């Protein structure tokens, strides 16, 4: 099965599929799945000596305001491989803008079926504060050395806002697809 055939999830927006592009703590390489072919491409080598604090991917069949699928940060006990699909639920969203416009990041945990470790985490406020600060720090600085690029981190919002973003992005995708 092609990555292009993966649905957004079983119980959207409560449970979504996330296709992992970048494993947590991986090398400073920005990978992106080509949405037409499903192939994993090197997007760029990051110029800052930083690593992603969580797994990083996207929800298929979505379109965020920046023209890309909705970005998702997935908290797991170990790094996931690029191209893996994981069933998640949103616990919050980091509101951000960058040189391309609105660039929110959904914060998600694996569904209870995959791991009971995260069932008590219902909102971003249940996530260890140090991890939230690490995520914010990463996104505030990961483009620092890239000319013409910038990021403004605007803060965390809860799971309701994250689910609204997921629903809006699916509607946007379906509207464009027609």
UniProtKB/Swiss-Prot annotation:
One of its GO terms (biological process) is phosphate-containing compound metabolic process. Keywords: Cytoplasm, Hydrolase, Magnesium, Metal-binding. Mg(2+) 2 binds at residue 71. The keyword Hydrolase applies. Pfam families: Pyrophosphatase. Its EC number is 3.6.1.1. Its cofactor is Mg(2+). Substrate binds at residues 30, 44, 56, 142. Mg(2+) 1 binds at residues 66, 71, 103. It catalyses: diphosphate + H2O = 2 phosphate + H(+). One of its GO terms (molecular function) is inorganic diphosphate phosphatase activity. GO terms for cellular component: cytoplasm. CDD domains: pyrophosphatase. It is an enzyme of class 3 (hydrolase). It is found in: Cytoplasm. It comes from the Bacteria. Homohexamer. Belongs to the PPase family. Catalyzes the hydrolysis of inorganic pyrophosphate (PPi) forming two phosphate ions. This is Inorganic pyrophosphatase. It comes from Legionella pneumophila.
């Amino acid at each position: 099965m092609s990555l292009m055939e993966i649905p957004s999830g079983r119980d959207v927006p409560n449970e979504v599929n996330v296709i992992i592009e970048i494993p947590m703590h991986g090398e400073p390489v920005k990978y992106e799945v080509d949405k037409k072919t499903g192939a994993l491409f090197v997007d760029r080598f990051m110029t800052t000596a930083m690593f992603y604090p969580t797994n990083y991917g996207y929800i298929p069949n979505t379109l965020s305001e920046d023209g890309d699928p909705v970005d998702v940060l997935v908290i797991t006990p170990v790094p996931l491989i690029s191209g893996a699909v994981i069933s998640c639920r949103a616990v919050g969203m980091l509101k951000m803008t960058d040189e391309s416009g609105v660039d929110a990041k959904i914060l998600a945990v694996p569904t209870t079926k995959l791991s009971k470790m995260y069932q008590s985490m219902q909102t971003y406020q249940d996530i260890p504060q140090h991890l939230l600060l690490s995520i914010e720090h990463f996104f505030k600085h990961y483009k620092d050395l890239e000319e013409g690029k910038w990021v403004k981190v605007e803060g965390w919002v809860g799971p309701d806002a994250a689910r609204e973003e997921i629903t809006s992005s699916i509607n946007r995708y379906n509207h464009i697809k027609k």
